[in-house]
């Protein structure tokens, strides 16, 4: 399988679900995974025997909540003591530990405790999407565009890029999710003069509002706003709390401390929420939810809307903020685009429609797929796709937060203003604060507050060796250079000596070191190899089991009466039963053991079966094309535990 040159994929790495697409033959294909689903849960599970990713991981979550990791996007690029991390930890069934100020997820895998960085968990989801694309395209894929919320800061973008590297991807670019949705939308709407588009993206875990202008194939992001912690999961949480209370009232029992019960309830709540987008009532039926009690109940759409009323109403605040930032009246918006599965909720649509005085909402793009669609187009552009559809597309992104440095008195002096189009480069001259000052400390911040103490420190460095001079005389030129991925380089130069020092905002922000990333790449390969070994082991076990059952049915066949001696028949049956009993207690044996046992059985059965067939036969087992020594041909049926 040679890599096809010039093919790149677009990946929407979501908090709860992810999606992958590819642009080929003039159109975007959203690629279904091995379960036939066009979105894949961003879940990774660890068990005593294997690692599961995607649907398989989500499907077993009720049985194994402590070792099933999701929401890695809420941890990625954050510090352990970040209030967001601390608040989320209370809701997660898995354990998050502090290692050198960074969060790691602690799970039990193959009987041992293992800790993973969020980047590693995300890389496993990315690997699954990469394999999904490779299975569809029929060749390896390395180039990808990955999307992030517009609100992600520098360290979250870097960490997402690192996750791509660990998964063996060459990340061409990190782009904002709303920008990707706009590309998808822009392709659907060709040249109609300048249009102002509001993108309302309410997904499983994040909420983004963006205002763009699209003019003649050029996209410009005018403003972004949102809430990094609002989405479908929060609506699920409201339903869960509601039903926990209902269970208390009905059965006088509190299930909130039982992780498995809560997880099963959450799964049912997510299903009910989806049902309520198309029906006015949903039923929940959970057998033996807690202490043997069956929980059968229902909820109406009106009650659901009441439970989430403040959250739904709250979605309009970022809309107003984005309009203010873009200095735009709501009447100036031409199109309102819905992105993210949660925008299917009728109440959310109604609130938005009412806010825009009854305007039609644009729902022509599948809200779950729009972001991956746009990322796939952007990937094609970056790979130099020359087709007319993508040729005229130019992408202008923005910096989500102002970037600047601390000046005398702890004041934030912004060089790159929030919502500036990126890539961009800004230079400013600074000077010393006191006489004969030998050096300056350059401290780089992101944020909108007037004082640096209220903003987020990205990194710092010293510029030393400034010749003695009165205050205000030395000239220090500071340049902020932000690239298309939103990654920042800051350079300071003393004009008199030409001395230079610089920083790329990476490690000081808790980014993984190069060594750590390399180690994780190796780990990822190791886990992949282990998964392969596990698959081979199961195949060997199934081969042994089906051979034993096959032999039992062959020798017990009524049509063979008299063709096989009773002692031979019993010999085979006893051996088969002995092996099947051995299998019962040795489910976790190694592949070699299964193979060895099968060979042992074959060696015993083959002479008897050969003798039987040489003796000529007329029974139903004849003429089936059975070749001694080889398992019977025919479809391979994978067994599901």
From Swiss-Prot:
Family annotation (SUPFAM superfamilies): Actin-like ATPase domain, Heat shock protein 70kD (HSP70), C-terminal subdomain, Heat shock protein 70kD (HSP70), peptide-binding domain
Superkingdom of this protein's organism: Eukaryota
InterPro entries (UniProt xref): ATPase_NBD, Heat_shock_70_CS, HSP70_C_sf, HSP70_peptide-bd_sf, Hsp_70_fam
Binding-site positions, ATP: 14-17, 73, 204-206, 270-277, 341-344
Keyword annotations from UniProtKB, A to Z: ATP-binding, Nucleotide-binding
Reported tissue expression: Expressed in spermatids.
Pfam family, one: HSP70
Coiled-coil segments: none
Outcome of mutating residue 73 to E: No rescue of PRKN translocation deficit in knockout cells
Region (Substrate-binding domain (SBD)): 396-511
Record region (Nucleotide-binding domain (NBD)): 3-388
GO BP annotations, alphabetical order: binding of sperm to zona pellucida; chaperone cofactor-dependent protein refolding; positive regulation of protein targeting to mitochondrion; protein refolding; response to unfolded protein
Any GO MF annotation of the entry: ATP binding
GO CC terms in record: blood microparticle; cell body; cytoplasm; cytosol; nucleoplasm; nucleus; plasma membrane; zona pellucida receptor complex
Induction comment: Not induced by heat shock.
Task of the protein: Molecular chaperone implicated in a wide variety of cellular processes, including protection of the proteome from stress, folding and transport of newly synthesized polypeptides, activation of proteolysis of misfolded proteins and the formation and dissociation of protein complexes. Plays a pivotal role in the protein quality control system, ensuring the correct folding of proteins, the re-folding of misfolded proteins and controlling the targeting of proteins for subsequent degradation. This is achieved through cycles of ATP binding, ATP hydrolysis and ADP release, mediated by co-chaperones.
Record-linked NCBIfam families: PRK00290.1
Quaternary structure annotation from Swiss-Prot or TrEMBL: Interacts with PRKN.
Membership in a protein family: Belongs to the heat shock protein 70 family.
Record text about domains: The N-terminal nucleotide binding domain (NBD) (also known as the ATPase domain) is responsible for binding and hydrolyzing ATP. The C-terminal substrate-binding domain (SBD) (also known as peptide-binding domain) binds to the client/substrate proteins. The two domains are allosterically coupled so that, when ATP is bound to the NBD, the SBD binds relatively weakly to clients. When ADP is bound in the NBD, a conformational change enhances the affinity of the SBD for client proteins.
Protein name (record): Heat shock 70 kDa protein 1-like
Organism: Homo sapiens
